[in-house]
């Protein structure tokens, strides 16, 4: 079996390199709205395509340097791998992070990355010179440390961005929206898995390298499908990103007491009308109806109810759902979930269990048991 894997590995990677290049071209040709909102998305799309193209290039460099023997190693391979892994990391990290934070790709960050990449590439290249052959391993380790520094910094910032985006969505949309960006986190870790396997594969046999190619093909297909699907929701989700200049102008100060007294009866009237049963609306929509702005309304909800916008709407819907469940114990949970404004039964069950400590079905059984007693 190992002999078969070794014999046909070049053919395999030739096919996979063409697949990566094809996926990159599909991504580049995929049309998005030619509007200012999608400017960051288009840039992220191009960066992701560039990353896929670099994976293909990495394979062709390996094919060119492969001697046909799995016991002989070309010392230039680790050098080029570190340089190309760094460039891939820039493409993938910049692409994924900017889809969460439109301001991620700044001149300051680009200058810093350019300097770090130059230093990393310098140490990787001089490690291959005959004059410094005795110091090859330490120099390669320094270059590898440069790559790791970049990756660790990105992991920290990406997770910070991811948590911030979830918080923004919770305080802007009435329904849960975090599942629309979950693929970014999955893609983020899939990419790091690829890098780890890539480093391991440098000195591994054909089996590990075959598995790596299947893994990378799957990763790139997953990213391609999700980034195309994400395009449909991108404009809506970006509404939750508070403009920095607007935020600075409005500040985070609490509304004046007189304004709170004015807003309180408006909110009370809105809740009595049960307008929160509408499936999807944003804090902007509600602020317009209440003749205020989202900053004041968000602050009011936090001070008045001790929770963010999404949690407040969910609590109102849960109370309505419990009334329906008491009145109609034979009703389907799916129908109740939709009737009170939840977008899906799993989301309703998750919110209900988090609030009540039991699932909706268990809660209904308990209510029925109490009635019989």
Task: Please place each PLM-identified region on the residue numbering.
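Key DNA-contact positions within bacterial/archaeal DNA-binding proteins
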Residues: 295, 345-346
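Alpha-helical transmembrane segments and their membrane-interface junctions
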Residues: 60-75, 192-209
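Hydrophobic alpha-helical transmembrane segments and immediately flanking/interface helices
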Residues: 73-92, 205-228
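Membrane-proximal linker segments that couple transmembrane helices to downstream signaling/catalytic modules
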Residues: 228-339, 351-354, 361-373
């Amino acid at each position: 079996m190992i002999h078969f894997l070794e014999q046909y590995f070049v053919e395999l990677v030739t096919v996979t390199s063409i697949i990566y290049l094809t996926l990159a071209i599909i991504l580049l040709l995929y049309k998005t709205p030619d509007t200012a909102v999608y400017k960051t998305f288009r840039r992220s799309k191009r960066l992701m395509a560039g990353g896929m193209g670099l994976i293909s290039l990495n394979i062709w460099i390996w094919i060119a340097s492969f001697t046909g023997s799995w016991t002989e190693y070309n010392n230039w391979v680790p050098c080029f791998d570190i340089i190309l892994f760094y460039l891939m990391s820039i493409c993938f990290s910049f692409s994924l992070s900017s889809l969460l934070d439109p301001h991620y790709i700044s001149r300051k960050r680009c200058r810093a990355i350019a300097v770090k990449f130059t230093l990393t590439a310098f140490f990787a290249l001089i490690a291959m010179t005959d004059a410094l052959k005795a110091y090859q391993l330490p120099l390669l380790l320094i270059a590898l440390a440069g790559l790791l520094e970049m990756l660790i910094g990105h992991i920290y910032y990406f997770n910070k961005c991811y948590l911030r985006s979830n918080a923004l969505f919770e305080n802007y949309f009435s329904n849960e929206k975090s599942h629309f960006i979950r693929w970014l986190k999955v893609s983020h870790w899939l990419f790091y898995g690829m890098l780890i396997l890539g480093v391991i594969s440098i000195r591994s046999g054909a089996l590990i390298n075959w598995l790596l190619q299947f893994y990378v093909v799957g990763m790139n297909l997953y990213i391609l499908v999700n980034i195309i699907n994400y395009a449909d929701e991108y404009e809506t989700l970006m509404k939750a990103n508070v403009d920095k200049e607007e935020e600075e102008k409005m500040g985070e100060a609490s509304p004046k007491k007189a304004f709170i007294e004015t807003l309180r009866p408006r909110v009370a009237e809105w809740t009595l009308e049960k307008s929160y049963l509408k499936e999807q609306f944003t804090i902007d929509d509600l602020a317009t109806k209440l003749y205020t702005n989202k900053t004041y309304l968000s602050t009011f909800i936090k001070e008045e109810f001790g929770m963010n916008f999404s949690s407040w709407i969910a609590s109102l819907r849960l109370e309505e759902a419990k009334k329906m469940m008491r009145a109609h114990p034979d009703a389907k949970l799916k129908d109740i979930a939709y009737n009170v404004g939840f977008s899906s039964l799993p989301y309703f069950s998750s919110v209900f269990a988090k609030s009540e400590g039991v699932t909706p079905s268990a809660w209904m059984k308990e209510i029925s048991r109490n009635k019989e007693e």
